[in-house]
Every structure is written in C-alpha cells, then in structure tokens.
C-alpha cells in the first residue's frame, strides 16, 4: 500500500493511517509507515506522529504498541443507527410493520454501507453454516423484493422466513442451504423479503 507522491509527508502519513486502519481494522506500525511514504528514519515518522497528535488528529498511548487512535475514525464509529429486529414474519404484511418489530439494535454507522431499509433477523439453526452464518447470529438484511442467482436472501415460504442462497432455474426457484446435511427447497414462486448484507455475532 503506497501513497502517491502528491502531498507533504505529514499529509501522506495521515492519509496512510486512515487508509490502512480502514482496510486492516488496526493502525500500521512505524516501519510500515516508513515504507509507505518512503522515509528511512523511524524517528522522522515519530516526529510527524507527534505533530499530528498536537493537532488533535490522532491519539497515542505510549505504553502500548500500535495503540494509535485516529480521531476522525473514532468519531465515525460513535455514530450509531437503529436497525429493527424483526420477529415473526406474516404474509401480506410489510416486513417493517410495527407488529413485526421485536426490538431495535444499535450499530456503528460505518459498519454498514448505508442505513436504507435495513432490518435484522435472528438466525435459527445450522442450515447456512458453510456460508459462515451460525445459529444465534444477527443477519443484517437490506429490504428488497428481487434477487439474482447466488444472492443470500430472506425468503417467505409458507409464512416462515428462511435464509438461503437464491437460484432461479428451469422455471423454478431453488433455495439452497449452505450445509451438506440439508436438501434444497424447490418452489415455483416465493416472496423475497431482502438480501443479506452483513452478520453480527457476539462473542
């Protein structure tokens, strides 16, 4: 990951900190910063980091390695959105009808690409474990009524919402589990309630 030579070193370092941290989920080491901005001296990088800290752009804990916090990103993470947790799904009723909403779940806004028409379903069972979707997970769903082959969707089958991989073929719809112990569900038609855009799991 190399920063273009189009700004002064301090700006290059700051931009690299943001880019690296967003990509990896943790800040870079001083040596990684040196390599990215073509500096040989770690002391020079430390000097730039100190000046960025004085400007209030970053915060460093000198007692811990890589303990560098980018204020801009920290503020983004503190912005929360409320996503409704949907319980029982009933045919003919809007998915986000008040009667369907069990609770609200707060999530940092930077964890999702947008907050338009999102809802959460609690995952029950192990039919999607090979896609990394486990029993008890919170599935974050973008409300949509259409799907393309290969999408992981929430479909309504006989008044029950199910999370499966969607395929339309030979005039039928195949809802494919991601677990070799389960058979696919083959139907002529079904209601698509939304598309999976994320998973939240508490440890």
Swiss-Prot record:
EC id: 3.4.21.88
Query: What NCBIfam families would the database entry show?
Result: lexA (TIGR00498)
What InterPro entries is this protein classified in? ArsR-like_HTH, LexA, LexA-like, LexA/Signal_pep-like_sf, LexA_DNA-bd_dom, LexA_repressor, Peptidase_S24_LexA, Peptidase_S24_S26A/B/C
Q: What name is this protein filed under?
A: LexA repressor
Read off the SUPFAM superfamilies from this record: LexA/Signal peptidase (SSF51306), Winged helix' DNA-binding domain (SSF46785)
Gene giving rise to this polypeptide: lexA
What is the purpose of this protein? Represses a number of genes involved in the response to DNA damage (SOS response), including recA and lexA. In the presence of single-stranded DNA, RecA interacts with LexA causing an autocatalytic cleavage which disrupts the DNA-binding part of LexA, leading to derepression of the SOS regulon and eventually DNA repair.
Gene Ontology terms describing biological process: DNA repair; DNA replication; negative regulation of DNA-templated transcription; proteolysis; SOS response
The keyword GTP-binding is annotated on this UniProt entry: no
UniProt-annotated site: Cleavage, residues = 91-92
Catalyses: Hydrolysis of Ala-|-Gly bond in repressor LexA
User: Which residues, as ranges, make up the DNA-binding region of this protein?
Assistant: 30-50
Q: Which family does it belong to?
A: Belongs to the peptidase S24 family.
Q: How does it assemble?
A: Homodimer.
What does the record give under GO molecular function?
Answer: DNA binding; serine-type endopeptidase activity
Q: Which UniProt keywords are given for this protein, alphabetically ordered? A: Autocatalytic cleavage, DNA damage, DNA repair, DNA replication, DNA-binding, Hydrolase, Repressor, SOS response, Transcription, Transcription regulation
Q: Which residues form the active site?
A: 127 (for autocatalytic cleavage activity), 164 (for autocatalytic cleavage activity)
Q: What species does this protein belong to?
A: Clostridium perfringens (strain 13 / Type A)
EC main class here is hydrolase
């Amino acid at each position: 990951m190399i920063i273009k030579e189009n700004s002064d070193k301090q700006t290059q370092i700051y931009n690299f900190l943001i880019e690296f941290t967003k990509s990896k989920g943790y800040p870079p080491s001083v040596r990684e910063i040196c390599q990215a901005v073509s500096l040989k001296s770690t002391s020079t990088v430390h000097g730039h980091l100190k000046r960025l800290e004085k400007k209030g752009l970053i915060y460093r804990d000198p007692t811990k390695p890589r303990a560098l916090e980018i204020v801009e990103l920290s503020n983004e993470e503190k912005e929360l959105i409320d996503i409704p947790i949907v319980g029982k799904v009933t045919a003919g009723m809007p998915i986000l009808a008040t009667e369907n909403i069990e609770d609200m779940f707060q999530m940092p806004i930077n964890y999702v690409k947008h907050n338009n028409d999102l809802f959460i379903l609690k995952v029950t069972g192990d039919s999607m474990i090979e896609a990394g979707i486990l029993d008890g997970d919170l599935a974050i769903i973008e409300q949509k009524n259409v799907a393309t082959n290969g999408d992981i969707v929430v479909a309504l089958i006989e008044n029950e919402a199910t999370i499966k991989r969607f395929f339309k073929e030979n005039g039928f719809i195949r809802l494919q589990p991601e677990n070799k112990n389960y058979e696919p569900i083959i139907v002529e038609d079904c209601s698509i309630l939304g598309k999976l855009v994320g998973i939240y799991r508490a440890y």
